[in-house]
């Protein structure tokens, strides 16, 4: 309806154009953005952070941003965003990309790990619930248009209320509304809160087995995936940052992460497995055939926090979809997860940071 200030830039691996703007009201037809045209293979849009909207345009190869500007409303035409792209070679693309980055950004070291949180011995255990996706990243969606980001947020809020009602836990959500949070920031949020448990909540989609794929699946971290399906799911979930237009970690970041896992995460992984088994025990009858799996999920890589990812159901299955949008079902499964969390802490196997 009016001209806004925008910031347009390129990202690599994969090739993307990012358009950042103030919080705007996107009024687009349902399902738009999936059609290919010229250099563009797809695009998406949404709230990226409070007060900030983002458009992410997927590009099929190396490119240059020739022009980018916003036209004022004129002659009954609304304000229009214009971005001209031209194809180029990989060398030129990389040179322009490097040229566009501020020197301090290019040379910046990875951010340090948050300082450990010191808590009183009698403090309540801290639990961080992580509703996956959000904002510009909807996650998967059902044939009816029910999105993963919405069902997992509703479920996380239900579980938070149940946990807080016990009076035994201090509970936080990584996001409380329809905003996007990069994977690294989700982990850092849990570390800053001094979490004793981290539970990432998602919903799955498996169109090849619409009727057969049903129920919850519990995942723990493993550098070697338990099976091909777990590996594919981890790849998809780890791609969340790219979908939202976030630069992916460099190889050096991965080396640091792997060192941290080797040094600090062995015992944490054991605790995560104990927690996962507790969930499986309480969700009996509501589980997928392969109820417990493992793979290299970035969001589970906190070296000091027992972390589990749960896919609460399949949006590709009509029966599961009905459950996922049902208040009664959410309440019932939330009660089971509270029992699983109670059981984990009652065993007191690990000295998790409370």
Q: In which residue ranges do the predicted regions lie?
A:
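Signal-peptide-cleaved, periplasmic/extracellular N-terminal interaction regions immediately downstream
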Residues: 1-126
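Catalytic-core regions of hydrolytic enzymes
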Residues: 102-256, 265-278, 331, 335, ...
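Short connector loops/turns at beta-strand edges and beta->alpha or beta->beta junctions
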Residues: 24-26, 132-136, 168, 313-317
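Glycine-rich, flexible loop/turn motifs
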Residues: 36-41, 137, 179, 214-215, ...
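Soluble periplasmic/extracytoplasmic beta-strand elements of cell-envelope proteins
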Residues: 7-9, 16-22, 42-46, 54-58, ...
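Short, solvent-exposed loop/turn elements at domain surfaces
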Residues: 7-9, 28-29, 92, 136-140, ...
């Amino acid at each position: 309806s009016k001209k806004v200030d925008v910031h347009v830039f390129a990202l690599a691996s994969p090739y993307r154009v990012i358009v950042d703007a103030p919080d705007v009201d996107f009024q687009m037809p349902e399902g738009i953005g999936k059609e290919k045209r010229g250099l563009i293979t797809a695009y998406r849009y949404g709230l990226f952070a409070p007060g900030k909207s983002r458009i992410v345009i997927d590009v099929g190869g190396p490119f240059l941003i020739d022009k980018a500007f916003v036209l004022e409303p004129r002659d009954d035409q609304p304000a229009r965003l214009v971005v001209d792209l031209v194809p180029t070679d990989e060398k030129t693309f990389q040179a322009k990309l490097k040229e566009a980055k501020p020197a301090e950004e290019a040379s910046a070291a990875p951010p340090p790990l948050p300082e450990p949180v010191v808590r009183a011995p009698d403090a309540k255990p801290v639990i961080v619930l992580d509703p996956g996706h959000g904002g510009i990243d909807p996650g998967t969606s059902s044939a009816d248009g029910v999105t993963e980001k919405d069902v997992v947020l509703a479920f996380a809020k239900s579980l938070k209320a149940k946990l807080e009602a016990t009076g035994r836990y201090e509970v936080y959500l990584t996001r409380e509304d329809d905003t996007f949070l990069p994977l690294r920031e989700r982990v850092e949020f849990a570390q800053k809160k001094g979490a004793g448990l981290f539970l990432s909540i998602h919903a799955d989609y498996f169109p090849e087995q619409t009727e057969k794929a049903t129920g919850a699946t519990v995942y723990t971290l493993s550098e070697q995936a338990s099976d091909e399906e777990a590996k594919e799911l981890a790849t998809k979930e780890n791609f969340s940052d790219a979908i939202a237009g976030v630069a992916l970690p460099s190889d050096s970041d991965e080396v640091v992460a792997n060192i941290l896992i080797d040094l600090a995460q062995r015992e944490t992984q054991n605790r995560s497995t104990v927690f996962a088994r507790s969930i499986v025990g309480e969700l009996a009858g509501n589980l997928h055939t392969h109820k417990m799996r493992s793979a290299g999920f970035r969001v589970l890589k906190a070296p000091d926090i027992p972390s589990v990812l749960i896919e609460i159901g399949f949006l590709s299955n009509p029966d599961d979809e009905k459950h996922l949008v049902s208040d009664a079902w959410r309440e019932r499964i939330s009660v089971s997860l509270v029992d699983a969390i109670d059981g984990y802490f009652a065993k007191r196997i690990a000295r998790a940071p409370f």
